[in-house]
Amino acid sequence: MLLLCLWWGIFCERNFNHNLYLLILKISPLARFFLFLAITTITTTLAGAEWMTGNFWINFGQGKVLGQNDFWRGLQFSLPFIGILTVHEFGHYFFAKKYKADVTLPLYIPMWLGFVAWPSIGTMGAFIRLKSQLKSRTEYFDVGVAGPLAGFLGAVLLLFYGFTHLPPLDYLFNVHPEYAKYGADYAKHVYANPGANIKLGSNLIFEFFENYVVSDKSLIPNRYEMMHYPFLFAGFLALFFTALNLLPIGQLDGGHILFSVFGSKVHSVVSPTLFVLFIFYASLGAPMPIDFQYDTFLTEKLWDNFLIIGVIYISVSRVFELPLNNLTLTLGIFGLQYVLKVFMPGLEGYSGWTIFGLLLGRFLGIYHPPVNENSGLSKGRIFIALLSLIVFVLCFSPRPFG
């Protein structure tokens, strides 16, 4: 979602691609919806086939070049993934329409990088745009919570199907013929030096399905192989994005829920606090301790540390109004991380969150706009808010990719 906002901010609001923006605006909203839906379905299908097979559509001198049959197979990834994404966005859309808000149909953002041999999922997601402000905390709550809960339900149903219809090991051996000689014990032999292989993390939903739903445990793929299984990979990504959207920060869906339940005063304290903790975790373990007397890499480490400080500062530069306060916060974060790195060198966060934190701090913001009608929520909505918190815990993975 944050990447989408970056895309919108750069290409639309800042007019860096003004002619393209005007061309898109001239298309009717319904035609634009179906056009971008079709393009994004194609790009996610291309990406899905690449993940399933471990090959690309272009000859880069190694591996097999994909063909037409692989494209049709890629639909096993794209259709459920785009389907869940659509359910999520229309959850927002229908509740916005219910409250007579001026809202756009979902806009899908295609992004396929296989032509340069980079892995991608074929899309940067989708978003709706509210052209008018919602009037009450209740409206913000209903619009905010509808998307992730709808998407979560779709993801769970997809994963139930995926885990109850796992293919035999021959499916994986067709992707990696070199594993076949090890049989069901392949994981004990082929990951001694995993190198640049991508490993999916875990979450409580996956743990539940693996431990209590799958009857033949030998069919459960290793974390390094999950992306070859389109239903599992699409479901994992759906849970990942659901968790991101439910972070109780700024104007993410979770931020709307936090604001709706507790009001602006609590949100203005809790949201920036959680954001700072998020940035702290993302860059935990990054500072490079320096021995000024004996360190042979003194210059490199100094530059690395200055770079880390710069990234943290850019991320938190809108927490306070005064730049000096943000600089003090930055140095405090870095200083504590530095001390922890000295005394607990194995303690690390997840650097993959850094870009997300940058986009959240710089483009979406961590505060929430006010509303005209500031009354609290009903007991039923409070219960749904607690349910959304449970959903967040079930979906969240501290290290989603490794």
Regions found by a protein language model. Name each.
Residues 1-402:
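Hydrophobic transmembrane alpha-helices and their immediate loop junctions
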